[in-house]
């Protein structure tokens, strides 16, 4: 048995060693930390969609702007509409700058809504920025071009309706379809349970669905051939205060209501689009590494070569920094409680 005095001495020495190691880690420069390192880019979605495409786009480019030029490797970790990845980013992953994530745009708002599946505070995450603030994008209600419905106004007429698809209960496409029906008063039937946009597009082509609600950049990226051949007709655009220049004749959701309560609900629902393609790291990473990641992200977004690559992929680039994301989250948190309660009621039951 080790004598008590010796055990105490060992404990003191161990504490000194741990403190020294921690001090050495703090003394390590950002470049030294990242040089030769593999950084993990977590994506809270399955391969193939816009979240995966943009994550791999950033993974290809971001390392060149981080001191030490680390390699960035993408890991898809889908689950609970992106909540699972955000929870792990906040509670599980190392807080040393070696893990970053492409989060679903609605995930920060779910925390404000009080979603019981959320176990993170979006105000404490280390936000790198967002590729898009939706300045050049819109969330479109689309039908096939051959559909007899030509405008959103027709959907207020007796006997005229469309059937839209959606995936899980709290997905943006399903929520905005419900808002169009229950808040804007459009004659819409909603069928849920589709596993993403691609199966819904197939259902539209087979005549099982009339349409869906999806981002302009997403449909141009995922359905490039059909879009270029004018296979779809937009009826309505969300996520914008004014009409996108590409759709000067298509009304916004706000144009279809004069009710202040409905407008406030739309404002809250559309806040997610201001941080449309967000990237974050865990809270509490060393300040110099956080700053390096944030600076690198915005430098990447300003590089003409990167912008050219984004254009080829159909990624809408209107970047904002991490501070702007925090401002949008604060604005959402200031929403009157009654509006959030109404929004949650429209969003329906929690995810399956």
Predicted regions and their residues:
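Sec/Tat signal peptide C-region and signal peptidase I cleavage site
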Residues: 21-27
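Conserved hydrophobic/amphipathic secondary-structure segments
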Residues: 28-276, 343, 347-351
